[in-house]
A protein has these predicted regions:
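Cationic, low-complexity basic patches in intrinsically disordered or flexible, solvent-exposed regions
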Residues: 14
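Feature captures the catalytic cores and cofactor-binding loops of soluble hydro-lyases/lyases
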Residues: 55-191
Length: 242
């Protein structure tokens, strides 16, 4: 796989864990997370975060990875959790900021930067949308002892926002704008998130895809005969063009 090829969830290998093994245990982690925390997480665990984390997406990655700026002073000591998201931020009457909702962004777009990002940021948890391939987890995450948490569905931006207690700091706001700036946020029970990529590089989505794919032929066999013979209608998986 090329360095930037991180789209999709990949395919889990036969003989590994099954979807029925997923327990979906609820877990609360306090940042910065420890190596023991990382090792304890299992695929499908429901995670809530307490403490401090920061937002970082394309603009911040460009500053840190491409321009070599490093994280702003003090951030790495506070937290090792990076949320791929944009905040809905506003200025309060006293001049401080409020973040009332966040919108996660798809993490595959950062694939080519992950190795250098982990080296320069010390991040151990990436929170984002949609997940990556198992190849990406094993190539980029596992060597740095990191895991991936995915947001759950759409429409939870306000729910996540209610867990934000305060804005600790904001960096590169004038240069990058609200959506791309780094927002350092104190949170309490921020979630739910799902463990999508664990410390061994396994993917929850790939595990689900594997079991779904095994039963697709059975699904096709149960389809009724199409009535109008329109282009693209079929009751055979092998005849599908996609």
């Amino acid at each position: 796989m090329s360095e930037g090829d991180t789209t999709g969830a990949g395919v889990a290998k036969p003989g590994g864990p099954r979807l029925s093994d997923v327990q979906m245990t609820e877990v609360r982690l306090t940042t910065p997370v420890s190596d023991a925390d990382i090792a304890s997480l299992k695929l499908g665990d429901i995670v809530y975060l307490d403490g401090v984390l920061y937002t970082a997406r394309e603009g911040v990655y460009r500053k840190v990875v491409d321009e070599g700026c490093g994280l702003p002073d003090g951030v790495a000591a506070l937290t090792n959790v990076n949320f791929h998201c944009s905040p809905a931020a506003s200025v309060k009457p006293d001049g401080t900021y409020a973040v009332e909702a966040v919108t996660a962004t798809a993490s595959f777009r950062f694939g080519k930067s992950f190795t250098r990002w982990f080296e320069r940021s010390g991040a151990k948890v990436i929170v984002g949308k949609a997940g990556l391939t198992e190849t990406a987890y094993r190539e980029y995450f596992v060597p740095h002892g990191a895991v991936y948490l995915t947001t759950v569905g759409y429409g939870l931006g306000a729910t996540y926002g209610r867990a934000i207690k305060r804005v600790v700091d904001v960096h590169w706001l004038k240069e990058l704008g609200i959506a791309q700036a780094m927002w350092v946020l104190e949170v309490e029970k921020l979630g739910p998130f799902l463990v999508e990529g664990d410390h061994e590089g396994r993917s929850l989505f790939a595990l689900a895809n594997q079991e779904i794919n095994l039963r697709l032929d059975e699904v096709y066999r149960g389809l009724p005969k199409y009535a109008m013979s329109r282009f693209g209608e079929t009751t055979s998986r092998k005849d599908e063009v996609v």
